[in-house]
Every structure is written in C-alpha cells, then in structure tokens.
C-alpha cells in the first residue's frame, strides 16, 4: 500500500475513510487498526470501532447500565490493570457495584420490563 494514500488515523472523526483503488480503508477510533473481520458501531458513529473494541465498548455500556464497574485499562495487554483480591483468593477480578440513582433505577426497570425479564 502506498503510504501517501494512507492518512493518519488521528482525525477527530475517527472512522476515517481514505480513498484507495479498491475501495475505502477504515480506522478504529480506539486502537487505530485498519484490519478487522467486522466493523462495529461506537460512540462516534456506525462502523467506527474494530471488532474487539466494539465488543469491549458494548460490555462497558452494559456494565455501566447495571452499575457495575470493572477497573480495567485496555490500551495494551501489558498495561491491563485489574483490581484483584489477594493472591490467596486465586486472583479473581472484583466487580464494584454502586448504588443506582432514582432515574437510573427507573430506566433499568423500564428496560427489564421491555425485555420481559421481570415477572409480575
């Protein structure tokens, strides 16, 4: 690939599409990769995240909705920081649950009712 045709992925609109002879090249908004088996929607729009970052983003959104916070950094495998229990507990990741505010509780109830997860 000609490096002159490949623009930098550091644009504010991260799903940068660059013209090439065969089509367009996308760039992930999180990890800046250009090759992935599937492009996923993210905070900057449809098809702005690679497969791995899209799955990670979706899991993060779900955990925030339920009030669960997992302390983790996903920038590189070496820099992953997980809040672990002491080594005597086998190194299990700790999930911290915060109390839901009134609006969040109402939103969660509506979500569960719409998914028919709650039986009356």
Curated annotation (Swiss-Prot):
Listed transmembrane segments: none
GO biological process terms, semicolon-separated: lateral root development; regulation of DNA-templated transcription; response to light stimulus
Keyword Transcription: yes
The protein's name in its UniProt record: GATA transcription factor 23
Top-level taxon: Eukaryota
Primary location: nucleus
Record organism: Arabidopsis thaliana (Mouse-ear cress)
Gene Ontology CC annotations of this record: nucleus
Transcription is among the record's keywords: yes
Keywords: DNA-binding, Metal-binding, Nucleus, Transcription, Transcription regulation, Zinc, Zinc-finger
Function: Transcriptional regulator that specifically binds 5'-GATA-3' or 5'-GAT-3' motifs within gene promoters.
């Amino acid at each position: 690939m000609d490096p002159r045709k490949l623009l930098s992925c550091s644009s504010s609109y991260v799903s940068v599409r660059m013209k090439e002879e065969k089509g367009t090249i996308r760039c992930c908004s999180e990890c800046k990769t250009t090759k992935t088996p599937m492009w996923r929607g993210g905070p900057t729009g449809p098809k702005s995240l690679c497969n791995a970052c899209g799955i990670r983003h979706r899991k993060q959104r779900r955990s925030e909705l339920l009030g669960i916070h997992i302390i983790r950094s996903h920038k590189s495998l070496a820099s992953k920081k997980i809040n672990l229990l002491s080594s005597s507990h086998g190194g299990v990741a700790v999930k911290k649950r915060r109390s839901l505010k009134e609006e969040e509780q109402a939103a969660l109830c509506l979500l569960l009712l719409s998914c028919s997860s709650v039986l009356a």
